[in-house]
Amino acid sequence: MTELKLDPYFGEYGGMYVPQILVPALKQLESAFVDAQQDPAFQAEFTDLLKNYAGRPTALTLTRNLSPNPLVKIYLKREDLLHGGAHKTNQVLGQALLAKRMGKKEIIAETGAGQHGVATALACALLGLKCKVYMGAKDVERQSPNVFRMKLMGAEVIPVTSGSATLKDACNEAMRDWSASYDKAHYLLGTAAGPHPFPTIVREFQRMIGEETKQQILEKEGRLPDAVIACVGGGSNAIGMFADFIDEPSVELIGVEPAGKGIDTPMHGAPLKHGKTGIFFGMKAPLMQDRDGQIEESYSVSAGLDFPSVGPQHAHLNAIGRARYESATDDEALAMFQQLARCEGIIPALESAHALAYAVKLAKTATKETILVVNLSGRGDKDIFTVSDILAAKEQESGND
């Protein structure tokens, strides 16, 4: 059996906790990834797709009206402008090319908000791969536009009714399917979590977010930002933003987890600050679990952050104090969803609205000139029906009071 080429751990987090049957498939994936990273032809094709199909580089936009403090400039890294509507497209193109390189004909994926599913469906349509997407039945309901998009592009969408019928259950089903079909199928994992080598692959295929940001902010401001801020579910958009800044000690890295109905309630999805280390989804990582070690249901108004664990590199960055992790509630995210639309003409994804909410809160307290960059990880078209229903219900409640 070949040895691993890359370190499967970030400090104490990560690893490859999978059934023995999947170990060869993961080792094959790692080996193909390492080779591809050193192959100029692979890199050229990936770069070409990012530029001419996905639309990179994305803009770095200085907000005109969002900052509550004249001392603070808030920039948005516009992953919402990427083809497919979110940062997900970046690494999906990378993994789909990798799958073709390994001779795989089928792609299996899981999705929460549907953005990863859409990105996977478009990459499969483009590259001629068969596509199967597992999605929690609850998410199928709350993300109908994305379900239709996936089907339109030829993907088979499989609703998962087990457990809480959300993202973690979709992950389990996708992993189960892959265990039975890894000889012909590639599991295209959607976040920087799961068993090694996925957290490393996803980070490397998302790191252009931070690389572009660094170049763009130096051009615009002549210096690095004081902080980069991103929402964290599994953590792929955040690690994509953080990766190129980890070795820049002057830049604070801030991840924003979903506080849901409040951190003091069971209705949240913030395992980094409020979970215990456990084994889940093939990795060792902070996990929302009860006293008996059973996985607790996570909760967030945003389907893409509704995940009971988090990527191992985020857990490590938190443990060593290199990044700090805050949280924003449903109400704060909903308020910011509307505020950005009204004051900048940009409708953010509910996920990204969590990061924006914390950035604005942080800006209020600044006492010196400060530059903040928020990763606007996706656009909010997928969320307009959810938000419209919530606002209508709130209006009705206040009318009944």
Curated annotation (Swiss-Prot):
Gene Ontology molecular-function annotations: tryptophan synthase activity
Keyword list, A-Z: Amino-acid biosynthesis, Aromatic amino acid biosynthesis, Lyase, Pyridoxal phosphate, Tryptophan biosynthesis
UniProt modified residues of type N6-(pyridoxal phosphate)lysine: K88
UniProt EC number: 4.2.1.20
Top-tier EC class: lyase
PROSITE patterns per record: TRP_SYNTHASE_BETA
Reaction it catalyzes: (1S,2R)-1-C-(indol-3-yl)glycerol 3-phosphate + L-serine = D-glyceraldehyde 3-phosphate + L-tryptophan + H2O
InterPro entries: Trp_synth_b_CS, Trp_synth_beta, Trp_synth_beta/beta-like, TrpB-like_PALP, TrpB-like_PALP_sf
Superkingdom of origin organism: Bacteria
Matches recorded under PANTHER family: TRYPTOPHAN SYNTHASE, TRYPTOPHAN SYNTHASE-RELATED
Stored NCBIfam families: trpB (TIGR00263)
Subunit (UniProt): Tetramer of two alpha and two beta chains.
Name under which the protein is recorded: Tryptophan synthase beta chain
Organism encoding this protein: Shewanella denitrificans (strain OS217 / ATCC BAA-1090 / DSM 15013)
GN (gene name): trpB
